[in-house]
Amino acid sequence: VFAVYKKDKWAFSGNFAVTGGGGKATFNEGLGSFESLVSVVPGMLVAAGNEMVDKGVLPINIFNGTNKYSVDSYMRGKQMIFGLQLGATYRITDYLSAFAGVRMNYVSNGYEGHIRNIEANIGGGEMVNVNKYFSDYAKQARTAADAYLAANDLANYAKYDAIAKEATKVAGLTADKELDCDQTGWGVTPILGLDFKMNKWNIGVKYEFNTKLNVENKTRIDNTGLFANGVNTPHDIPALLTVGVSYEILPVLRASVGYHHFFDTNARMADAKDPVTGQTMGKQHFIKQG
């Protein structure tokens, strides 16, 4: 929605729009990043088995042959920035005009999803729930470890204690994950612009300053550990420089070219974790590598 009021050398304008992109989407089979988390499970189990064999905990790798997985995953999300912009334009000369204004931004994000029932063909057998398998395995190993400790058989206690710890670790990594969270926040963007028009040429320049934003989590469900309720996360809108040039070739034909540059490196953004390695990645990872 756009409106303008013009009087003499002044023009006062306002608009309301969804700015900076945004939208909503539903992924009934989850996101690719969800799949990447689960796809490493077979290899992780085989590697864990090899490690326990090397340490003398297991005589053979009972997880060899694990090469299949499945998962029930789902994601629905939205990211919207609603902007109310007000500004004034003044005609300095017959050829040059200047604009100054501000935009009030309101961020409305929402995420709902899950990763459930991770299964694998452990040891090349039938597909089973990995979390349940290793939870039961950990309980059995812990019971055996406690019994050996009571009998003062420290060698077997150490072996079954190691099995219980490793099984508990795998069970935790493959537990169901659920998220239901909204995020809201607001910030103000100062805007400056110049417009030059002479004969058949028209040149426009606009600069939008960096918008400092924090979004606050309103979390209903989260066992991912990533969206704690009440936490504020950096969500800046980067500064933007745009330049446009047009030339009137004919009264009914114009040629134009434009350039825009987002100053991403100066904007505060939340860090993320690599879904495979678990390492924290700063914003520069995404800016430089995508």
Predicted regions and their residues:
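Active-site-flanking structural segment that lines cofactor/substrate pockets
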Residues: 1-2
